[in-house]
Design a protein with these regions (language model features):
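Short, glycine/acidic-rich hinge or "gate" loops at secondary-structure transitions
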Residues: 66, 86-97, 243-250
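Alpha-helical solenoid scaffolds that mediate protein-protein interactions
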Residues: 54, 66, 73, 80-81, ...
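Internal, hydrophobic cores of structured domains that mediate oligomerization or house catalytic pockets
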Residues: 71, 77-120
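Residue-level detector of alpha-helical recognition elements and their boundaries
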Residues: 12, 62, 69, 88-89, ...
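Residue-level signal for alpha-helical context at structural boundaries
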Residues: 65, 84, 91-92, 203, ...
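Secondary-shell segments that build the walls of catalytic and ion/ligand-binding clefts
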Residues: 1-32, 100-261
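Long, hydrophobic/aromatic-enriched structural stretches that serve as scaffold segments
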Residues: 22-85
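Amphipathic alpha-helical scaffolding segments
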Residues: 68-76, 97, 209-215
Length: 261
């Protein structure tokens, strides 16, 4: 498919999705899993923003930038699919809450760790400062924060490691062919990571694609995969509502039909 055809498909998919959400809101349908709805909606909105940016830079032939956005889409898609899989098996908001609260805290703590390491370097401190004490001193409202809290956060977010998510998805799917498909994306994720981290392998990949005249072909492939990921993530948002099974089936089937290649 050309970029223009993918744009048209995505616009049709988005319009139907918005219509479905509007019907849900107008009928005041219950969010059976409100935290899942919040998390999945947020993820799908971020995916949409990244996908639209990917389309723009791909049309300009910017393969390096496209790979960076592509990697972000793959990771965010895995998170939404993993959360949807957990929802279907657990039937509660626990994993979504871990994502919303514990993962955010973990990311915030990582930022604070960066500040601590920066301070140690600036002040030429030879022995590494105690992180827990650093948090307590800097944020008096967190005076009760201790290593047990750190451990709790760490344990809660282990499930969001990319390999752990893929392993869970693969095991939870009855269709092993689909499960194997997710597993096969791991090398793709790793390859795109070289672009994110500015590795020399990324430079080699770009040079190789240029030499073979395959930049355009690779960009079209990446955009196609990203399109499917973004659409599926939006469809999964509907699963957090109490809908009549037939209504859900009709919406999902029509959305799936639109995104078919």
């Amino acid at each position: 498919l050309t970029y223009e055809q993918i744009k048209q498909k995505y616009e049709a998919h988005s319009n139907l999705y918005e219509r479905a959400i509007e019907i849900i809101k107008n009928n005041d349908l219950i969010k059976e899993f409100p935290i899942y709805y919040e998390v999945l909606t947020d993820c799908s909105e971020r995916l949409e923003q990244i996908f639209k940016s990917l389309l723009l830079i791909s049309e300009e032939g910017k393969i390096y930038s496209a790979q960076i956005l592509y990697r972000a889409i793959i990771e965010l898609f895995f998170k939404t699919f993993f959360l949807t899989s957990k929802l279907s098996t657990d039937k509660n908001d626990e994993s979504a809450e871990h994502f919303k609260v514990h993962l955010m805290l973990s990311e915030w703590l990582a930022e604070q760790m960066g500040y601590l390491e920066m301070t140690d370097l600036i002040n030429d401190i030879e022995n590494k400062s105690d992180f827990v004490q650093f948090i307590r001193d800097k944020f008096p409202e967190l005076k009760e924060f201790d290593k047990e809290n750190q451990k709790e956060i760490s344990n809660a977010i282990k499930k969001f490691n990319i390999k752990n998510m893929i392993a869970y998805i693969r095991e939870s799917l009855t269709d092993k062919e689909i499960g194997n498909y997710f597993t096969k994306i791991l090398p793709e994720y790793s390859r795109a990571s070289s672009f994110v981290h500015g590795g020399p392998y990324a430079t080699y990949i770009v040079k190789n694609l240029k030499d073979k005249g395959q930049i355009e072909k690779e960009l079209e492939r990446v955009v196609g995969v990203a399109f499917s990921c973004t659409c599926v993530a939006k469809e999964n948002c509907l699963l957090s509502f109490k809908l009549h099974p037939d209504d859900m089936k009709d919406f999902i089937n029509e959305l799936r039909e639109i995104r078919k290649f």
